[in-house]
Amino acid sequence: MNNMNKVIIIGGGLAGSEAAWQAANRGCQVELVDMKPEKYSPAHSSPLLGELVCSNSLRSNDPTSAVGLMKREMRFFNSLIMDVADSTAVPAGKALAVDRDKFAEAITARLESHPNISISHREVTAVPEPADHPTIIATGPLTAEDFAESLAELTGRDRLAFYDAIAPILDSESLNMDIVYCKSRYDDGPGDYLNCPMNREEYERFISELASADYMPLKDFEDAKYFEGCLPVEVICSRGVDTLRFGPMKPVGLPDPRTGQDPYAVVQLRMENAEGSTYNMVGFQTKMTYPEQKRIFRMIPGMENVEFVRLGSIHRNTFICAPELLADTLQIKKRPDLLLAGQLSGVEGYIESAAMGLLAGINAARRAMGEELVSPPAEMALGAMVGHLTKSAAKNFQPSNVNFGLFPAWEKKVPKRFRGEKRAEASALALEVWNEKWQISEQV
């Protein structure tokens, strides 16, 4: 393969497969490198490309949901993943689920038969040296140790994580502001935190439920070695009834305006976006099952009817600190010949990983062809996801799936029942204008 219009992609999961398809369809000569079957991660067992490791569900197909919007945008750009998913779908109500074996078989067959794609099965142990052609890194959440070590040398060790620790994010409009109050500890700051106060009885009942909750079991390839600075709330709880009250739920310096006194305990909520439409629960990363999170966290005063934008989780996941390292084109800022895609870039979920592969493939092709690289508008699901990667606060960055909390705030209040529809309309318009300007969907 000569360097003319050459693109190399490392990793044959959903992101790498989609990236290869997009770049090849734009006339690039693509080398897709995957270490299977020479070497397998602890979670993989099939030699096929596009292997689904956990669930076979690709979530909602509803075009007024955030992930449904992302799927619609991907289909517009002739997504391999979406096309194969649609053709291998199994009955799943309003969700899109696939026959995982047929899904991986079809992806592999489509890529192997593409005239512009060559596939190599070998392990890449180091980040490639700077080159004239673009390289997409899509090695996934279980990136092999040697490659992760090399990537850490490039990014800085403090900018590469090996576990994500995600606390729930909630819709601020669903909070009971008759109970919840704004205040920074000891008034040290402008009062950016929201506080949910508890008396002793409420706290002890909450702790009791937390201690007996149902939890997601660890996968075979995960272990329970957590960082002390980012412990699951249930692990802290197991160390004693008052441990949380002297940790994330410390009430000192946060007097309740209704009483003028410090509460017995407090749950703090930190603003997740500049508009204040979503907040995260400070220190509440958890492995509780989703139903248990909803049940137990709605016991918190002021959160009785709370609506969650994202629920908490903790699992093995290699990912970079995207806000410090990535441009909105998915290029590594200090190495513009390198693009990142998939969960390694800081997204969560099959569709989100494939979507970042789609964008990386488009931009790698544009770079190889000498064209200007593009970034989707924030009104699109693709753009909202890129915004999370590049505009979040670096200090607290954690992976996320696509959700409406990542989209721009409404200029005027929109009734809740119409929000999905309005997001879909705005996304469709933004997509049309963006594509018309840059001619992104043009295929060779």
From Swiss-Prot:
GO cellular component: cytosol
One function term, GO molecular function aspect: tRNA (uracil(54)-C5)-methyltransferase activity, 5,10-methylenetetrahydrofolate-dependent
Keyword list, A-Z: Cytoplasm, FAD, Flavoprotein, Methyltransferase, NAD, NADP, Transferase, tRNA processing
Coiled-coil portions: none
Family in the record: Belongs to the MnmG family. TrmFO subfamily.
Protein name: Methylenetetrahydrofolate--tRNA-(uracil-5-)-methyltransferase TrmFO
Summary of the function given for this chain in its UniProt record: Catalyzes the folate-dependent formation of 5-methyl-uridine at position 54 (M-5-U54) in all tRNAs.
Highest taxon listed in the record's lineage: Bacteria
Entry-linked InterPro entries: FAD/NAD-bd_sf, MnmG-rel, MnmG_N, TrmFO
Any single Pfam family the record assigns to this protein: GIDA
Catalytic reaction list: uridine(54) in tRNA + (6R)-5,10-methylene-5,6,7,8-tetrahydrofolate + NADH + H(+) = 5-methyluridine(54) in tRNA + (6S)-5,6,7,8-tetrahydrofolate + NAD(+); uridine(54) in tRNA + (6R)-5,10-methylene-5,6,7,8-tetrahydrofolate + NADPH + H(+) = 5-methyluridine(54) in tRNA + (6S)-5,6,7,8-tetrahydrofolate + NADP(+)
Disulfide bridge positions per record: none
Record EC number: 2.1.1.74
Positions of FAD binding: 11-16
Location of this chain's protein in the cell: Cytoplasm
Lineage of source species: Bacteria, Pseudomonadati, Thermodesulfobacteriota, Desulfobulbia, Desulfobulbales
HAMAP family named among the record's database cross-references: TrmFO
Enzyme class: transferase
Main location: cytoplasm
Cofactor(s) for this UniProt protein: FAD
NCBIfam families: gid_trmFO, PRK05335.1
Transmembrane segments: none
GO biological process, one term: tRNA wobble uridine modification
